[in-house]
Amino acid sequence: MALAPELSRQTKLKEVAGIPLMDPTVNNWSQIQTFKAKPDDLLICTYPKSGTTWIQEIVNMIEQNGDVEKCQRTIIQHRHPVIEWARPPQPSGVDKANAMPAPRILRTHLPPQLLPPSFWTNNCKYLYVARNAKDCMVSYYHFYRMCQVLPNPGTWNEYFETFINGKVSWGSWFDHVKGWWEIRDRYQILFLFYEDMKRDPKREIQKVMQFMGKNLDEEVVDKIVLETSFEKMKDNPLTNFSTIPKTIMDQSISPFMRKGIVGDWKNHFTVAQNERFDEIYEQKMDGTSLNFCMEL
C-alpha cells in the first residue's frame, strides 16, 4: 500500500525565521504562536535526541510520586504533548495541550525565540536538557534514518554537512543550546546536561524534584533512578515508541532507543571529520561559558 503523501520520505522542511521545521508544523504556525500557556505549566525543552524521553519519564515519575502504575496510564508520547507537533488529520500538539487539565507538563524542541510568547508572559517553568553536539549528531542521524516523516538524511558524510550547517529539523544545535543557556538566569529555567544525568542520575533527579517543588523520600528517588534507567525504558513499550506505526518510525532500520551512552560519536566520526568539527565547534561556541563532556 502506498504511503499517504504526508508520510512519504519526500517530506520537506520549511523555514520559520531561518529555522528549518517540518512542513505541517509551519502550516500550523499561527495556532502554535497563539497558544495560551498557563502560569503553572512546566515545559520540557530539548534539542532533538538530547534525552527528551528520559527526562520526560523522570518528570512523570516525580509527578506521580514514584507510582509505577500511574506512570503506565498511557504511552509516553500522549502524556506530555509537543507544542509544535502537527500531523493532520491527527490532533495537533496545541489541541492536545488545550484538552489537558492544569497543571500541565508539555514539551518542545523549539529554540527560545520561536516559543509561543505566552510562555514568557506567564513566567512558566522550563526544564532544559543539553547533550554534547557529537553524540547528539550521531543519535539524530540514526533517528533521521528511521523516522519516515523526516527527509532522507543520505549518507553519514552527507548528513554531517547538513548537521553542522544547521539544516536539520529544529535548526542549529549550536544556536539552540546557546540560546537557552544565555537566558537561563532571566527565567525559571533548570538547565541540565545529559552527561551529568548519565554520570550521577540520582543527583540530577533530585535537582528536578526540587525544581518541581516535590519532596520525595530517598527510597522513592532510588526507585525512580531504577525505573528510568536506559535498560528499563528500552524494554518498556510505553516508553520505547514501539507502538508507533512502521510508516512513521521504522525501528527495523534503527531503534528509537539505540544506545543511550556518552562517546558513541567515536564510532562514527573519521579523524578528519573530528578535526573539522572541533574547529567549527570552537568558532561557534566562542564567547559562551557552556562546557560539554564529550566522553565519560
Swiss-Prot record:
UniProt xrefs under SUPFAM superfamilies: P-loop containing nucleoside triphosphate hydrolases
Main location group? cytoplasm
Chain segments annotated as transmembrane: none
Amino acids binding 3'-phosphoadenylyl sulfate: 49-54, 131, 139, 194, 228-233, 256-260
Q: What class of enzyme is it?
A: transferase
Would the keyword Kinase be found if you checked this record's keyword annotation?
Answer: no
- Tell me the superkingdom of the source: Eukaryota
Give the positions the UniProt entry annotates as the active site: 109 (proton acceptor)
One GO cellular component this record assigns the protein to is: mitochondrion
Q: Where in the cell is it found?
A: Cytoplasm; Lysosome; Mitochondrion
Q: Tell me, which GO biological process terms does this entry list?
A: sulfation
Concerning Gene3D superfamilies, the annotation shows:
P-loop containing nucleotide triphosphate hydrolases (3.40.50.300)
The alphabetized UniProt keywords are: Cytoplasm, Lysosome, Mitochondrion, Transferase
State one molecular function term (GO).
sulfotransferase activity
Q: What is its EC number?
A: 2.8.2.1
- Substrates-to-products reaction catalysed: a phenol + 3'-phosphoadenylyl sulfate = an aryl sulfate + adenosine 3',5'-bisphosphate + H(+); cholesterol + 3'-phosphoadenylyl sulfate = cholesterol sulfate + adenosine 3',5'-bisphosphate + H(+)
Q: List the expressing tissues.
A: Highly expressed in kidney and at lower levels in stomach and liver. More specifically found in the epithelia of proximal tubules of the kidney, of the bile duct, of the gastric mucosa, and in hepatocytes.
Free-text function comment from the UniProt entry: Sulfotransferase that utilizes 3'-phospho-5'-adenylyl sulfate (PAPS) to catalyze the sulfate conjugation of phenolic compounds. Does not transfer sulfate to steroids, dopamine, acetaminophen, or alpha-naphthol. Except in mitochondria, where it can add sulfate to cholesterol producing cholesterol sulfate, which alters mitochondrial membrane organization, and impacts protein complex mobility increasing state-III respiration, thereby modulating mitochondrial respiration.
Task: State the family named in the UniProt similarity comment for this chain.
Answer: Belongs to the sulfotransferase 1 family.
**What protein name does the entry list?**
Sulfotransferase 1C2A
